[in-house]
């Protein structure tokens, strides 16, 4: 993870020079695919969770689960469109808080983890050792390329949804570099690889807030959660259905942000064919991963993500197919 993070960071020095590979047609397609692939996860969260043991629970999908998710969605809509200022901007957060409170009143919140959590803890670097595994490093580096493509799409979606403009080369390079450094730091402390959080594309598109100060404040809060486990435990105690209500809105907004970018595309036969083939292979392989069962495991993981084949096809076809002036 550490070396893969450094590789990801290095991609930031080149990604800006490849900006012409990601016009609105490609960037919008990437964001649309991300959003469409995330929506089923949001539905599963609202129903009670996406893990197998949660889905196999007889209570999965019952009204109490969906009721909490709907509370979050309804409160978020009310706050977004019937209030102004900070209340409107914080609509999703207020919806989550309302859903959390309702869940507590319904007795669906277990605070046992909060009681057991420490008040203060310092992360230990390389707690699990440092194992140099060439195969694992190559795998993480390949996934870093996929993550970098997702980052380009996410940054493009953020600038389009939050400021109604295209992302600059500096923004693309900086975002990719920051993702890589974050992954490297996560590897030092035994964490998982980082990637840009596509849900935030929807959140920023909905709120219109893309201030670095706001993001930095959120980062400080996350650090506090890491250093003060009780704070993190309180958040972790939130029922998955409450979170599901929020992410349904955000995942849907991700897809909407991609559609918004595609609205700027001239829809001639060339561009329609690029979208059709890229979308078909991207979503098709994601929905039917068994179609790849005779490929090596690494190839299956990369192609079944849907994002890589969709982005690769869109980039290649956009570069090789001749331009058309008329729709």
Model-derived features with residue positions:
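Membrane-embedded alpha-helical modules
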Residues: 2-109, 219-327
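Helix-loop-helix hairpins and the membrane-proximal interhelical loops
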Residues: 54-59, 88-173, 296-299
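Short alpha-helical transmembrane interface motifs in multi-pass membrane proteins
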Residues: 60, 138-142, 181-186, 240-244
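Membrane-interfacial loop-to-helix junctions in multi-pass transporters
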Residues: 66-67, 128-136, 166-175, 209-213, ...
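Alpha-helix initiation and N-capping motif
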Residues: 119, 178, 197, 228-231
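Membrane-embedded helical hairpins/re-entrant loop segments and their flanking transmembrane helices
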Residues: 141-212
């Amino acid at each position: 993870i550490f070396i893969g993070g450094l590789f990801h960071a290095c991609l930031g020095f080149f990604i800006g020079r490849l900006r012409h590979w990601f016009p609105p047609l490609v960037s919008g397609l990437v964001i649309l695919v991300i959003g469409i692939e995330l929506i089923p996860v949001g539905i599963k969260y609202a129903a009670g969770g996406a893990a197998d043991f949660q889905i196999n629970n007889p209570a999965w999908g019952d009204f109490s689960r969906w009721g909490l998710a709907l509370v979050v969605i309804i409160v978020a809509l009310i706050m977004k469109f019937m209030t102004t200022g900070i209340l409107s901007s914080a609509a999703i957060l207020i919806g989550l808080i309302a859903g959390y409170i309702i869940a507590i009143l319904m007795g669906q919140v277990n605070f046992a983890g909060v009681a057991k959590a420490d008040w203060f803890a310092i992360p230990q670097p390389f707690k699990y050792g440092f194992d140099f595994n060439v195969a694992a490093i190559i795998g993480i580096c390949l996934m870093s390329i996929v993550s970098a493509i997702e980052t380009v799409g996410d940054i493009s979606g953020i600038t389009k949804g939050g400021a109604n403009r295209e992302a600059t080369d500096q923004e693309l390079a900086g975002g990719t570099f920051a993702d890589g450094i974050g992954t490297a730091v996560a590897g030092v402390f035994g964490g998982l690889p980082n990637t840009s959080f596509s849900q935030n594309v929807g959140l920023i598109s909905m709120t219109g807030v893309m201030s670095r100060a706001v993001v930095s404040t959120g980062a400080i809060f996350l650090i506090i959660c890491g250093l003060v486990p009780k704070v993190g435990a309180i958040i972790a105690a939130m029922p998955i259905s409450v979170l599901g209500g929020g992410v349904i809105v955000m995942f849907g907004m991700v897809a909407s942000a991609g559609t918004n970018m595609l609205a700027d595309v001239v829809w001639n036969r060339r561009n329609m064919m690029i979208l059709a083939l890229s979308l078909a292979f991207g979503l098709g392989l994601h929905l039917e991963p068994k179609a790849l069962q005779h490929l090596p495991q690494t190839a299956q993981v990369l192609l079944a993500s849907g994002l890589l084949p969709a982005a690769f096809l869109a980039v290649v076809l956009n570069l090789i197919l001749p331009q058309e002036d008329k729709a």
